[in-house]
Amino acid sequence: EEALAAVRAAKPDAQVNPGFQGQLKLYEAMGCAVDSSSVLYKRYRLEMLSERLSEPQDLPREVFAVDPTSISQTPNTEVLYRCRKCRRALYRSSSILSHTEGSGPTAFAHKRITDSARLCGNGLEKCTSFFIEPVQWMEPALLGVMEGQLLCPKCTSKLGSFSWRGEQCSCGRWVTPAFQIHKSRVDEVRTLPVGNFHTAKT
């Protein structure tokens, strides 16, 4: 902001490229360091990719998270998410792209409100889905189409949906692009250190 003010002091009509300004803000938000594992970085990369896509025929390999089945062990600090029906490992907690809670279904009053977007019994809006980064097992479903269903790669049960144009979360927030997994279709599996096993059982 100070640099921009200095430039405009000399040239009042000077403008900054919005994309470059967005990159600078992202860099600042990440603590002035490039962190490809940051949720902010992952979300920004996907947003930029979605703006360029018309029919995704060839997606960059780096946008896909590693399939957890190809990893021998999940770090103790991470939660593993499995298909509730067949127990196939689907993604890790580091793949979840959190978002700011929206203002509820009323934010999309002009659109058809889905059942999952209705108010909960206690009057509070809740996120009934996880929005995640694409995982390697999703690639065949994503190629050549802008939206579709996300099915378990093992048992083919429906897990959620995706849309490069974006989807509405039940909290009212519009997420673009969206790779949405319904919480009711997955189970959390937490890995405990060996020393805590006895404590966890009791």
Q: Which residue stretches match the model-derived regions?
A:
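Short functional micro-motifs and their immediate structural scaffolds
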Residues: 91, 160, 174-177
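Cysteine-rich micro-motifs
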Residues: 107-110, 167-173
